[in-house]
């Protein structure tokens, strides 16, 4: 919110509204701060490639997840872990509204914030004046379906990045679109056996190369850093930019201190929706991801795959996939980007239908767009917030 306030300082939004943000339970400066791993444990986690999908390899990966879950339980306790989650955060939002003495809120939610906004308007529909949800999460999707669609979205973004990179003969992925994924694997797969060179003594692990790549795919503004990091791998030289991208995603500062964002994210998602525990279901998901997101897939399909961390979570879920409740007429607008890697476009289409809200479509390759400089989107959002002028379905 601090960054948004600066970018909106000359906007009608700043003239008409106070900007209020909050850290949900366990996140950021909220207390107690949810922390499951020490900084050293986070570094060690990132050194694990976790790509051996043989039965023994899967068992070893799942043991790492079990250890994570146990550390969360030991350090935070079951009552607190059970109290985090979107359902609780929506109630906390209403407590903030009441504390501010406001009858209604005007809400802008990005990415996970769309899930939080959907939960709020479901519980407190009369307390919403205007709500804009950008980068939507479809509340009807189960975790496996959502994971496959998200990975497919990152493949689309990777293809866009590679096509842009491939316009230059110096592109580390080459210039042949049919070879982009193969060339990528030739650069990153050797990191499973040996980290790549960086000025940081940690080196670049395979996991960090993947994480750094994924982070760069959120916005074209990061593509140049991805290219720089991949060029470093190609030359056997310095891959610092890929490590910096991974550190940015993981919330690690230059002194080696981590934010608690990733631990909190995992704790929240694990209580928000039931996670299948059948190993066969996860093997099927692995097969689907290999088909739809080949740049993320190491080695060959084995018929085995590790279950997600949430399959071992020590507290029960507090919600389940279900359609969003229709929003009061004229109170909500959904924004979705055609090639959003993290929250695929179709999720926005589906959420808008469930809320019976208009949809603003932005044609682009990035994660979220409101107040990122697109006049078509921003003008419609400002008119909606300030004057409650509800846009029709709009294409920008």
Please report, for each region that a protein language model flagged, where it lies by residue.
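Glycine-rich nucleophile elbow surrounding the catalytic serine of serine-hydrolase chemistry
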Residues: 90-91, 109-121
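N-terminal cap/lid subdomain of alpha/beta-hydrolase-fold enzymes
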Residues: 1-57, 62, 338, 350
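Short beta-strand/loop motif that positions the catalytic acidic residue
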Residues: 328, 333-336
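A catalytic-pocket lid/entrance helix-loop region that shapes and gates access to the active site
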Residues: 35-49, 119-183, 228-254
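Conserved acidic catalytic loop of the alpha/beta-hydrolase fold
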Residues: 75, 79, 90-105
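Conserved alpha/beta-hydrolase "acid-adjacent" motif
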Residues: 341-346
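Alpha/beta-hydrolase fold active-site neighborhood
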Residues: 181-329, 357, 373, 379
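Catalytic active-site module of serine/aspartate enzymes centered on a nucleophile-bearing elbow/loop
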Residues: 363-396
């Amino acid at each position: 919110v601090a960054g948004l306030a600066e970018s909106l300082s000359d906007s009608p939004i700043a003239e008409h509204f106070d900007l209020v943000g909050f850290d949900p339970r366990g996140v950021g400066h909220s207390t107690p701060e949810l922390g499951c791993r020490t900084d050293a444990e986070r570094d060690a986690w990132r050194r694990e490639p976790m790509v051996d999908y043989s039965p023994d390899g899967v068992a070893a990966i799942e043991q790492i997840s079990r250890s994570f879950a146990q550390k969360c339980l030991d350090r935070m306790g079951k009552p607190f872990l059970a109290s985090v989650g979107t359902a609780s955060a929506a109630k906390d939002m209403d407590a903030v509204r009441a504390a501010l003495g406001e009858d209604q809120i005007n809400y802008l939610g990005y990415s996970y914030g769309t899930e939080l906004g959907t939960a709020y308007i479901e519980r407190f529909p009369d307390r919403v004046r205007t709500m804009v949800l950008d980068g939507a999460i479809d509340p009807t999707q189960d975790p496996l379906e959502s994971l496959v669609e998200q990975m497919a979205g990152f493949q689309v973004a990777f293809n866009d990045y590679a096509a842009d990179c491939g316009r230059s003969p110096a592109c580390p992925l080459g210039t042949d679109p049919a070879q982009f994924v193969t060339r990528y694997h030739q650069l990153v797969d050797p990191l499973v056996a040996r980290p790549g060179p960086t000025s940081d003594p940690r080196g670049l692990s395979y996991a960090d190369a993947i994480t750094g790549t994924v982070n760069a795919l959120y916005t074209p503004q990061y593509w140049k850093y991805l290219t720089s990091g991949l060029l470093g791998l190609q030359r056997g030289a310095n891959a610092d930019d890929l490590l910096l991208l991974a550190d940015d995603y993981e919330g690690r500062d230059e002194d080696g201190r981590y934010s608690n964002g990733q631990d909190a994210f995992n704790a929240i998602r694990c209580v928000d929706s039931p996670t299948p525990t059948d190993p066969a279901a996860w093997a099927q998901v692995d097969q689907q991801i290999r088909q739809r997101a080949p740049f993320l897939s190491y080695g060959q399909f084995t018929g085995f795959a590790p279950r997600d961390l949430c399959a071992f979570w020590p507290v029960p879920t507090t919600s389940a996939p279900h359609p969003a409740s229709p929003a009061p007429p004229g109170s909500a607008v959904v924004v979705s980007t055609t090639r959003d890697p993290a929250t695929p476009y179709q999720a926005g289409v589906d959420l808008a239908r469930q809320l019976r809200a208009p949809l603003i479509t932005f044609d682009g390759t990035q994660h979220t767009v409101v107040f990122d400089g697109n006049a078509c989107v921003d003008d419609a959002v400002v008119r909606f917030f300030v004057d409650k002028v509800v846009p029709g379905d709009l294409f920008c």
